[in-house]
């Protein structure tokens, strides 16, 4: 007590507490804390299963496509110019993908009736880059509910919260995701690259090799490095026919004509 003044012990106010940082998967929007989790399947994981209605009838993925490679890809919206150019290219290349043992499956968050009307318009009215009367016969998923798009992490809120980005999932015959490519809404895909990645993955699996930068079919492949000192010594003393070693860990070779023909046959 100091005269008429009472001095009380200091108590830390609740307003002085250290700020509590929200979890990393939590965002604060308009003063409301909302938990938002965005699950994105990763390379090497099993592709998530789903059932869906498509322009080719109902599908069960991956059960309906056992033993096949699959390109599962999303586009932002029907009746848009960049997506139209892509679907014309996918349609024109569909037989090429079939020869590679690969099934195309498209997706957007549009309805089945929208898909059908759009594909009909592409076939009957659109001409682009020398392509016309393109008849798209691979499945295009009705995903108005955004179920599949969310399952595969195709909705990127920073780009759009209501449209899928241009995602491409390369899925092998065992339903394992082997590669993923994303493009933004305004940029159409590079179809030569899509084909290169598919052929590259098939080459890797068939011949147990790796592929160097900018590899294209017919280029040299990278052979496995020695795993022991004995193997390293054998490689230096008796290099395999057709193998060029740039150093002990970096050796390449050309696929033989028989191997290249085997790839062409599929």
Task: For each feature predicted by the language model, list its residue ranges.
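Extreme N-terminal basic, low-complexity initiation segments
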Residues: 1-12
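Chalcogenol-based redox active-site neighborhoods
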Residues: 31-266
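Generic short N-terminal amphipathic or hydrophobic helices
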Residues: 6, 26-27, 31
